[in-house]
């Protein structure tokens, strides 16, 4: 995960294969039609190849998306924040698809999964006689897939700070910068370390017999400290020697262990990828603007550049609401008023 650190250099190397993603960019755009149909585009800027078939959105040509790939650096250095990393993002993958409704989109992009990015869309159209209002939202589901709750490591003040973070790239005060550094330290040096350990520990518990389970639980805290102490002499893959030293004969080369480990690693790799991303989200919704929570607006295009922290531990919703006049209703109302006025005038003349 981003800035992932552990006390033991050896254990860090062991984790590196799981938490080894590099910075990348994700741009998502939705054009909303009056009938609720959607045109969605998801663009990935990355150093990695083969993302057209293997990506954390689970989308591709097989799922009916129109896919285009550009491996030139110029494509990856489009209008974005000026940074050194722009020249390193060599691949651009663009995925486009039209959906009849938000529900159809959700069937594909919001399916529950521990190893995929989940995006839920919502569209509401309400008739108000003189106006019709249009509400649209996209929700990024929390990227934290650890079973360990973060509430024991983060306070309400921390979550309020995250909620108030400005768009990515916007300046923050020195005090806020110091607070953010400390927050990241608690997230990655404390919460992520413990959560990562608990996932593997529970994996071993699931494979242990009664006697082995008792030993594991008895030595749980000492195992944790040993894994993260600075001068640990463990191998890069510490579990075999650790279990052997405790006399716990769990076979970590078994097919069942490898299967469970692969499942866990797919979840960890997703979290690592998601936390390293730079995000830009766009909603296009015609009409007179009523309300929104966008970072910026140009015409009827609403833009967000959220920090990954916005949706690290809880869902984050981007929304916009507009309205359009109902011409027929206005004309009908005017005709009714004219008819009433004409009737009153005739009565007065009588």
Predicted region positions:
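C-terminal motif of bacterial Sec signal peptides marking the signal peptidase cleavage site
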Residues: 18-21
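Residues in flexible loops and secondary-structure boundaries
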Residues: 9, 38-40, 291, 312
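Bacterial N-terminal signal peptides that target proteins for export
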Residues: 2-9
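Mature, soluble, non-transmembrane domains
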Residues: 72-337, 341-344
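Short, charged juxtamembrane terminal tails flanking transmembrane helices
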Residues: 346-350
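Start-of-domain marker
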Residues: 23-85
